Amino acid sequence: MRDYLEIIRRNLMSPIVIAIFLLALALLYAGERRDAWFISVVIAVNTVIGIVQEVRAKHALKQLELMSAPRARLVRGDEVVEVMYDALQVGDEILLEAGDELPADGVVLSARGLEVNESMLTGESASIDKKKHDEVYAATTVIAGSARVRVTAVGDATKAGAISATLKQYMPRLTPLQQAIQNAITFLTYCAIVLSLLVFARYRIAGFESVRILKTIITSAITIVPEGLLLASSLLLAFGSLKLAQAKVLPQKLSAIEAMALLNILCTDKTGTLTSDEITLERVEPFGSGNEPVKQLAAMVAHETSGGNATGQAIITALDLPYEYTVDDILAFSSARKFAGVRARVDGRVRTLIMGAPEYVARMAPLSTAEQQQIEKWTDDGLRVLLLAEFDDNNTPLKSLKSGSGRPLAVILLRNLLRDGVVDTVAFLQRQGVNIRVISGDNPRTVQYVARAAGINNPDTAITGAELAELDEPAFATAADQHTIFARVLPEQKEHLIAHFSQQNHQFTGMVGDGVNDALALKKADLGVAMYAGAPASRRVADIILLNNSFNSLPLGMRLGNQIMQAIEVIATLFFHKIIYGLVLLAVTLVLGVIHPYAPRHITFLNIFLVTMPTIMWTLFPPRSHHRINPHNFWRDTLGAVTPIALVSGVAVSITYLMLRAMQPHDQDTVSTMTVLVATFFGIYLVFLAGPMLGVVLDRRAKTARMLYIAAALLVASTSFAVPLLRRFFDFTIPTLAMIGPVAGVVVIAALLQWHLARRAGKTYQNR
């Protein structure tokens, strides 16, 4: 409820709303009731509509957010049920696995190789072992092992409660584009104040009465300040988020849509992203005599340490466990170590076993040259290779086994096929100018094989995490820029790489991942993309969640995001057209010292056709673009395209006004009526110019919407003239043919010139 009250307060207390209401009170005090009541009602209606739309969008996004919100596994008797974090109570018992974010503070009842990252609380990224009776804290992450925990504190009562309380407050953050629009509104507001002073001084010198000066000041302010542009962009981003969610791409932040439009580097994991979730065991190749039960030993290590990950499940599914064994100690798998271990009594014999990446396990259990060459051959074929080793030392903790003290028993070969459609997805991204980098914890040869099969450019440029670790910062930066494949990379190295790419000028970096080892990198990226089935910790920090767990959803998401950004550009041109032509008309009247043709209610009437109705149309039916939109070029693309057209509108409206004023010097109502009609025509005409001007493509629905807009505009305009009450309210008169003839010539010439300018702007736009 607090979130919605904040929305209401923010909309009602907007400086623009307050200023317009104060000006309306001034008009009321001056006896101009029609203008006072009309602009008050209009701004009130617009504010209510804005509140309703924002509340609806907030509610819808909150419902979607609940879809991706992580759940806690609550133990109830003999059952385990998934519940929302806020449903937990002190005394509840929950189960934790690798990748989980702790939902509450608690005490460990039992643990199997539990390691926790407490960097969210302490800033230290090193993992911490947790045993029975140890305390664990909310907002920390399980990076290895599993545990059963009794909840001791929830919500604001946890150690991270102060942080959580801050996060609960509804503090909408503007996207970079929205911030630019907000800055423009602030700047134009100051301009309106300066212009108001100029209007007051010039018209006071010219001898105009105070009421007329006040009306002109209000008219100028309403014309210049694009008060609805920020709201329009917010609603477009919100409704765009809903459309993306329907396409199985869930933005957790409004800025994600803009980020997709800016993306030019995409770092992706291999397993579960480029390749499918399904990993299959090809075979087990024993070393030595082959008398050891290596398949059963590998199955035992996977069963006790994998924490349910896909690699472990593939081994467990394909191989049988030993008939009987008792575990003495385990070392759960973690991405930082690249291996796992078990010490167990099997058939009466103590076995100390390590299984993991050959490069890491071989440091403790050396391989012969022939064995290393054979492993390289398997990785060249795209197989994922694990090395199983045994140690005679049955007393030293598994973490502290001596280098070189073990012997290799076997290699486990697994196959992980490309996801369907990955080749097309990679091709689409690269056509859009996105540079794809693969950052993986796997063997470099295996990663290169997958990258080559996926069609990623420059797959032969590879470097390992061990090589990166030996480089100083300048050399690291050079290596990062020169390589496409980063293999056997540690989680903190992933974060370092993402930070480097993001710091480059005009580089906007995305990261796609699903594991707990990806969480740091996802958080550091400009655009973090997580899989719905991935670790809760990665989902928590991501900007976008792929609800169908498919990397192939990104192109559709980028297309929809591009549509939304294009719609914002089109709507912005409507506002800028209104502002620029209004400034031209105001400048002409100030220089010549003549009365301004509009009353405040005329500006509101014009805004219906120039801004409100087209904005609704483009919001409901966003256009498609021939090219990829870049929000960095927002001002150049919008102002650069519409300024010449708006100047023509301003000159044409000014000529019309001065010409009619000369023809009918004593009939201000008729002159104002014709001036309003001409300005309305140019506003409606701009909707047709948007296509050639910005390279917009209208599908059948958008073309139908445009025709409905024309029909609605004609209906509203004709009603305003046909109904005597409305006609009198706006001080409109029925134009005569004698006045329409000269005006038509000016309008036709201006319209032809604008069409030429729009076509030229479109060609320039598309050639950038």
Report the location of each language-model feature:
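Membrane-water interface of transmembrane alpha-helices in multipass transporters/channels
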Residues: E32-V42, A180, A206-T219, L229-L231, ...
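Conserved beta-strand/loop elements of the cytosolic catalytic core of P-type E1-E2 ATPases, chiefly
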Residues: I49, E79, T152-G155, K168, ...
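Cytosolic catalytic regions of P-type ion-transporting ATPases
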Residues: V41, A69-Q182, R384-L387, E470-A480, ...
